[in-house]
Amino acid sequence: MNRRRRIYEGKAKILYEGPEPGTLVQFFKDDATAFNAKKHEVIDGKGVLNNRISEHIFTQLNRIGIPTHFIRRLNMREQLIKEVEIIPLEVVVRNVAAGSLAKRLGLEEGTVLPRSIIEFYYKADALDDPMVTEEHITAFGWASPPEIDDIMALAIRVNDFLTGLFLGIGIQLVDFKMECGRLWEGDMMRIVVADEISPDSARLWDITTNDKLDKDRFRRDMGGLVEAYQEVARRLGIMNENDTPRPAGPTLVK
């Protein structure tokens, strides 16, 4: 790892130079952060689980024709991805009132929304990722109107897919965050889904008990984060049924 050139390090992942031009290696760390890293802890096994869950989801997205940056998983913590120009926006799709939306609008957490809502947040930790409008996005040149249309179309398709995927394993998709990037192929450019989709970036509730199976367990000091992520992986079929939580981290199907 030390021989590779580090391109970027974020709160939960590191990007290294890839083996071929136009590729990067995405490494998943065990760091758990909340409130723009004001709360931080290292949790053994979290990176392994996020890598496997995100791999599973991105593989399925690619399979149904939703373009992503994902190429393949390299090992338990790393993925090979296409190099993209990240658009500095977090795209949040909400199906159920929770988190900041419930607080901002005075909604009872768990209220099913009349329809799915798409929100944009400007990626700037120093500013606490402020919510922005399409007017802000176009005025400051973060994305063009056609690109916004593409991003919203992708967000709707991903939401439809994830809602069905998780419903089939007894989980309600409350909301999720995704990022997009510009993938250049010669003179052609298209918008693709980038970053990761995992319990770090989605609120996932057990459909029967409303038990939280996501990073809210860390945000709210509930404990059991790795066990919750393992449960998601088990239901998705990427963990052995007989695997049990261990301090050294999870055991996953290769």
UniProtKB/Swiss-Prot annotation:
The chemistry this enzyme catalyses reads: 5-amino-1-(5-phospho-D-ribosyl)imidazole-4-carboxylate + L-aspartate + ATP = (2S)-2-[5-amino-1-(5-phospho-beta-D-ribosyl)imidazole-4-carboxamido]succinate + ADP + phosphate + 2 H(+)
| CC per GO annotation | cytosol
Q: Which GO terms describe its biological process?
A: 'de novo' IMP biosynthetic process; cobalamin biosynthetic process
Instruction: State which pathway it belongs to.
Output: Purine metabolism; IMP biosynthesis via de novo pathway; 5-amino-1-(5-phospho-D-ribosyl)imidazole-4-carboxamide from 5-amino-1-(5-phospho-D-ribosyl)imidazole-4-carboxylate: step 1/2
The protein's matches in Pfam families, at most eight in alphabetical order, are given as: SAICAR_synt (PF01259)
Q: Give the keywords, sorted.
A: ATP-binding, Ligase, Nucleotide-binding, Purine biosynthesis
So which domain of life are we looking at? Bacteria
Q: Does the keyword DNA repair apply?
A: no
MF terms in GO:
ATP binding; phosphoribosylaminoimidazolesuccinocarboxamide synthase activity
Q: Which family is this sequence assigned to?
A: Belongs to the SAICAR synthetase family.
Name of the protein: Phosphoribosylaminoimidazole-succinocarboxamide synthase
